[in-house]
């Protein structure tokens, strides 16, 4: 009788573990720096890391389709040669990869004048409808550089702003808030149709959760506590910052994704503010959906960053998934594991 009970218990435990695994999927946000062309061997490194990590979804930033090519199709072909089947569609500036068949795709914010873009796919993951968005938001009027004494459009040295209002005025001169408002509108439509939402992207703007009273005198924040626009809009609309949900303290887990160190590139080519500490968490994965939960999050890339034109190893409690070979970009990526709990 005891043996039967033990066998039943083990069987139930196994089924429970398997059901948890069945509900899990991973999302990789990755700015690939001009399709990896800025780093020798960069494209092959992108493919090799996807083969290693096998994420369910990849949200790319800086897709360029050089010489009238189709980057997404090229990636699918390269992965197929290595025995992996992924799905995608033509896009520019941002891109999407999916392990799961894509049932629909949409341009939410088309690229125009290099002010960023947002695309969306629909897919089903283990019976759950998922809408995955990729965003590369406007890099101009990049106001966190103004705080550090650099113009956020020309990157020339300027006097530092004295008020938060000055900073936010520059910030909203960009098209980042316009793009994210369109995302929110479309995402609400998708949710009304039963979809859970994932948004991965390089926002080119920090989080209001990272510029607090506790760190206002760190990282060249210039004593400022700033309610950055894009993440505030997302949070007000019910979207959850996966990294900050898991690691709520920016002192212990700042989660910097830019500028990443890259040993194949000289430090002066990795910085836009050579005299400043410009480290920021600008690559995000936000989400919202019934029964959807972020389980794990890890920074993907080198453990060192660029600070005042120097390579500096991070000493925070952030967890890193180090690259196996060539690092193809000047950003760090973000890999998040999600699970459906119902």
Located regions from the model:
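Residue-level detector of structured alpha->beta connecting loops
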Residues: 54, 99-101, 238
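Metal-dependent phosphoester-hydrolase catalytic domains
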Residues: 122, 188-198, 204-342
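Short, solvent-exposed loop/turn elements at domain surfaces
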Residues: 34-41, 59-60, 141-144, 208, ...
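N-terminal, active-site-proximal structural segment of metallo-dependent hydrolase catalytic domains
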Residues: 2-5, 15-82, 280, 320-321, ...
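Active-site environment of divalent metal-dependent phosphoester hydrolases
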Residues: 35-37, 65-69, 115-116, 140-143, ...
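A solvent-exposed, charged loop/short amphipathic helix patch at secondary-structure junctions
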Residues: 145-173, 214-216
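Active-site beta-strand/loop signature of hydrolases that rely on acidic residues for catalysis
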Residues: 25-32, 46-69, 132-135, 166-214, ...
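Structured beta-strand-rich core segments of catalytic domains in phosphoester-bond hydrolases
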Residues: 39, 63-151, 296-300
